[in-house]
Amino acid sequence: MDAQYTPHAIESAAQTFWDKNQCFKAVEDATREKFYCLSMFPYPSGKLHMGHVRNYTIGDVVSRFQRMQGKNVLQPMGWDAFGMPAENAAIKNRVPPGAWTYDNIDAMRRQLKALGFAYDWNREFATCDVDYYRWEQWFFTKLVEKGLVYKKMSTVNWDPVDQTVLANEQVIEGRGWRSGALVERKEIPLWFLKITDYADELLADLDKVDWPEQVKTMQRNWIGKSTGVELSFAVADSSEQLEVYTTRPDTLYGVTYVAVAAGHPLARQAAQDNPALGDFLEECQQGGNSEAELATMEKKGMDTGHKAIHPLTGREVPIFVANFVLMEYGTGAVMAVPAHDQRDWEFATKYGIPIEPVIADAEGNTPDLSQGAHTEHGKLINSGEFDGLEFDAAFDAIAARLEANGQGTVKTNFRLRDWGVARQRYWGAPIPVKYGPEGQTVPLTDDELPVALPMEVEVDASGSPLKKMPAFYDLGEGWTRETDTFDTFMESSWYYARFASADNMEAMLDERADYWLPVDLYIGGIEHAILHLLYARFFHKLMRDFGLVASDEPFQRLLTQGMVIAETFYRANDDGSKDWFNPADVDVQRDDKGRPVSAILREDGQPVEMGGIEKMSKSKNNGVDPQAMIDRFGADTVRLFMMFAAPPEQSLEWSDSGVEGAHRFLKRLWKLVADHLDAGTPAALDADALNDDQKTLRRKTHETIAKASDDIGRRTTFNTAIAAVMELVNAIGRFEDTSPQGLAVTREALEACVLVLAPIVPHACHALWDALGHDTPVIDAAWPQADEAAMVKDSVELAVQVNGKLRARLDVPAAADKAAIEAQALEAENVRRHTEGKTIRKVIVVPGKLVNIVAN
């Protein structure tokens, strides 16, 4: 073999071998245990970032490890290709989104292949391929027929300049993220999927999956199952009733006002005779309508002049319009208890509304409400016949009274809302519905599918071009086609299943889906904990109920990898803005502990400020180009650093010196193998003929195999597995025995290193395995098995303490009994010196660890 480690030649040769031999093509085999490993597929931006590299390296290491366990492994890759960024790029660069997207896919595929990931590229697809989304359209028509889809008026974020609907995350401080215009709330008809029909099952089945508890908790909170009371407040001088839902009926006697949404019929009716209220309702239509935005916005309201009648006391309380109440959530009306709800307290304080406590504090006294609401449970006060009851008893008693009066009922509610799947955008899958001349709404038939998105279009900022293309929407005889497209979460909600049968042009899925699903390990960022992962679970249950899949859940195990973070450097400008400089352009002075002390921009030699360690991002200019690292060090070095620098769930701090260290390690391993091959031919290993040094190295080899097997297979702590191999490499480097048995032990140790590292640095290990004389490639090798006999020690070292202080170390036979160990410990010279003239009171032997002698 070449004595020099030349990563690019080595990696090119390995990748050529894998491609030529279709090494990663997955074929269903009912006689073998399968393992489906999937990393969340990327948006094709055109350039991989280090977050991608980390995610996909973790998946690749697990996939290759499971293959070495003898499993039939599927690891596919595709592209989450629809969405806003392509439209924005099209507007900016004046190119069709489709052309931009497919060019980016080609560029990113090259980058992924350069990293040597073991993907079955035969199954690749992009979600903008008509052969993919045609089945989504087909399935949607089936959901319409089953009554799981409906269309209703819904409030959206409307950008009056761009003339388009914005997602909540595209509204920044009440303004459109691109136009900067004040966003309006506007009602338009939208399509919804009935995810709420599955709320109970989505909640219960979280117990079936091996996911991080944090993610399960986030989903439970998002689904938000609660038990409360739905009750009615009559409107004074009217036949109207206001329906409200509360989880705190125990606070009912503390209601001092009712708040309704600006879109509530009562608010609109009141505004007809009140121009000021009309202006306020219009103001409420400005700004975003996300819960996050509502939580931070200034709370505003206006009295409607109407009164609500308290259902138990008969007292009249004012009805306000409040900007924090939305028609989309619940009934569009809330009962307000300012003494015991902080938001209600702030509103009441602002508008001079009475605040009346009805729950005692922990001491049983009237709570102090001068600084805020008292939100804890406690005994009821000022609540008539219900005084003195604790929460549970009060809940039941007040609910029973309301039910008896016909004014309320106990109800289970969910925070979860049905999924709005329509977007007024161009770059998405067209919704397969048509509208008739007499107002008919009809799903398209199978022979009208697919509805292909026109690809050669000019996109500008004035909204979807589909609305301006009669060739697309005009079906003749008064029939028109829907011009909305699907939310891109639709495509990512079932892609994992399509990988099982991606080549089937006749069906959405086939029996191969039942072989591969569920996904055994799904890997991605925790930022997808709610929407994507919840929608995918819902979609899976829909597919199950249509007989398309057999399992209840899509992803059996979930691994949420941490961020890749790096140092940041900037200079502040006079206007308060900052210019950020890439770490590659900055020289950093560090103290003796490696901490940064000062930094200078190389270009001008002037100092820059250190902004601390942050997630790699364009905005902070602290990203590292993976391709530049591959070009400089090779893919294996990048992969090794990614796996060694931190456990997968934790943030990984980028370190140039760490990358250089990973590269040095690979060069060292390469040289050890080359030197070993130059040293001669080893004998067949004879475990019974080994001397102590040979046994020691062999023991280290098998301890390393045992540790790495557990670290990778069970704990997924790849960094500790790599650390164990590094220790073994150090031991091999110190072992200079070139006798036939010495070479045999060295050969076994080196082969163990290569096998354990093969999932992590596959290119180098492909070459090293071949150099070590194997006919079959390392990709087809089995994971090494630890030899229990080799790990048995002939002797063990024990610490000997006298009265708790270390006085000696003993080498004793591993099989020695307590009496023999005790005798040997008492004979040790330094022990005798410290026990001379004293009475031995007790000798405690902790097998394998220490001897403690008590003497006085």
From Swiss-Prot:
It catalyses: tRNA(Leu) + L-leucine + ATP = L-leucyl-tRNA(Leu) + AMP + diphosphate. It comes from the Bacteria. CDD domains: Anticodon_Ia_Leu_BEm (cd07958), LeuRS_core (cd00812). GO terms for cellular component: cytosol. Pfam families: Anticodon_1, tRNA-synt_1, tRNA-synt_1_2, tRNA-synt_1g. Gene3D superfamilies: 2.20.28.290, 3.10.20.590, HUPs, Isoleucyl-tRNA Synthetase, Domain 1. Its EC number is 6.1.1.4. The keyword Iron does not apply. Its main location: cytoplasm. A motif ('HIGH' region) lies at residues 42-52. Keywords: Aminoacyl-tRNA synthetase, ATP-binding, Cytoplasm, Ligase, Nucleotide-binding, Protein biosynthesis. GO terms for molecular function: aminoacyl-tRNA deacylase activity; ATP binding; leucine-tRNA ligase activity. One of its GO terms (biological process) is leucyl-tRNA aminoacylation. Belongs to the class-I aminoacyl-tRNA synthetase family. PANTHER family: LEUCINE--TRNA LIGASE, MITOCHONDRIAL (PTHR43740:SF2), LEUCYL-TRNA SYNTHETASE (PTHR43740). This is Leucine--tRNA ligase. The lineage of its organism: Bacteria, Pseudomonadati, Pseudomonadota, Gammaproteobacteria, Oceanospirillales.
